[in-house]
Curated annotation (Swiss-Prot):
It is found in: Cell membrane. Residues 71-91, 141-160, 231-269, 329-377 are cytoplasmic. The gene is gpr54. This is G-protein coupled receptor 54. Belongs to the G-protein coupled receptor 1 family. Disulfide bonds join C118-C198. Keywords: Cell membrane, Disulfide bond, G-protein coupled receptor, Glycoprotein, Membrane, Receptor, Transducer, Transmembrane, Transmembrane helix. It comes from the Eukaryota. Its main location: membrane. It comes from Oreochromis niloticus. Expressed in a significantly high percentage (45-60%) of mature GnRH1, GnRH2, and GnRH3 neurons and in immature GnRH3 neurons, which had migrated to the vicinity of their final locations in the brain. Only 5% of immature GnRH1 and GnRH2 neurons have receptor transcripts. SUPFAM superfamilies: Family A G protein-coupled receptor-like.
Length: 377
């Protein structure tokens, strides 16, 4: 989302031209370049692409498994899982179409894929990130609705509705991302020789700040606040009895234990979902906001390192989503075991043995109690 602009591979001074978005890196064009003088090769030139490759591997495998499990098992085709599949699809598109191009920016001195790919990759990156944020918000609203209004949700919360909402999410994401097509372009720069850079070029600083502020609100602040609000309502609602319990101490105690257990599980899920999204996307969003609005901001190698780390954090979110939204759910775990039983043979065998041992112990205790009762009689 922000990686194609101002990715500096030099610790030397950055010269700002024009509106502040066009830049030259390294030596001036007038500087005499000695024979054999080449641009420096930093550790991040290979370390960052290696990290991105790991993200792609984990993310593609995890998200593909999520979609495969949902499509293979009929009982998994629920409204919530439809949103999860949509989220996995956005992550796959992001990982395949955006991450490889971003990874090349670190070992290469500039953009080499032309103006069309500059616009296309940046636009698709913005679309997928926007769709991810809106999908997360829709998932939170869906879970909140089914928790707070369980009876009403039986009529309105269907896979068909989830499909319609998902289509609207994609359409809205395409529309909201159109400014990228207008402002993303190839710009000339100089870094140990003339280079080309794929970056956003706005008519004025006001346009640039307005777009960055929109990105911060629509793609970070609003989803985080909405998710937090929805799950706060869920924590308050989950565990409350829908019917009055009978006057039975055992039932009251059992209900209390279930309430505490469910409330604890939902609270943990809230912490994971909100913190994961906030931690992964927060640094890059705040950095770009600071970069645009802070008047004394100075681009240098230190800020480049911070931005590189922030980009890695945001990209990693696409690989960890399946762990949180998929494999932490009991239904996904069961379906995954059914789909790949050969991976869980040892665990299933141990579970069966433990079950048989427990049954034998229960029968032994029951027999002992029966013998004791006969002796008393």
């Amino acid at each position: 989302m922000y990686s194609s602009e101002e990715l500096w591979n030099s610790t030397e001074q950055v010269w700002i031209n024009g509106s502040g978005t066009n830049f030259s890196l390294g030596r001036h064009e007038d500087d005499e370049e000695e024979e054999g003088d080449k641009h420096p090769f930093f550790t991040d030139a290979w370390l960052v692409p290696l990290f991105f490759s790991l993200i792609m591997l984990v993310g593609l495998v995890g998200n593909s498994l999520v979609i495969y499990v949902i499509s293979k098992h009929r009982q998994m085709r629920t409204a919530t899982n439809f949103y999860i599949a949509n989220l996995a699809a956005t992550d796959i598109i992001f990982l395949v179409c955006c991450v490889p191009f971003t990874a090349t920016l670190y070992p290469l001195p500039g953009w080499i894929f032309g103006n069309f790919m500059c616009k296309f990759v940046a636009f698709l990156q913005q679309v997928t990130v926007q769709a991810t944020c809106i999908t997360l918000t829709a998932m939170s609203g869906d879970r909140c609705y089914v928790t707070v209004y369980p009876l009403k949700s039986l009529r309105h919360r269907t896979p068909k509705v989830a499909m319609i909402v998902s289509i609207c999410i994609w359409i809205g994401s395409f529309v909201l991302s159109t400014p990228i097509l207008m402002y993303q372009r190839i710009e000339e720069g100089y870094w140990y020789g003339p280079r080309q850079y794929c970056m956003e070029r706005f008519p004025s600083k006001t346009h640039e700040r307005a777009f960055i502020l929109y990105q911060f609100i629509a793609a970070y602040l609003l989803p985080v606040l909405t998710i937090s609000f929805c799950y706060t309502l869920m924590v308050k609602r989950v565990g409350q009895p829908t019917v009055e319990p009978v006057d039975n101490n055992y039932q009251v105690n059992l209900l209390s234990e279930r309430t505490i257990s469910i409330r604890s599980k939902v609270s943990k899920m809230v912490v994971v979902i909100v913190l994961l999204f906030a931690i992964c996307w927060g640094p890059i969003q705040i950095f770009v906001l600071f970069q645009s609005f802070y008047p004394n901001y100075q681009p240098n190698y230190a800020t480049y390192k911070i931005k590189t780390w922030a980009n890695c954090m945001s990209y990693a979110n696409s690989s960890v989503n399946p762990i949180v939204y998929g494999f932490m759910g009991a239904s996904f775990q069961k379906s995954f075991r059914k789909t790949f039983p050969f991976l869980f043979k040892h665990k299933v065998r141990d579970s069966s043995m433990a079950s048989r041992t427990a049954n034998a112990e229960i029968k032994f205790v029951a027999a002992e109690e029966g013998n004791n009762n006969n002796a008393v009689n």
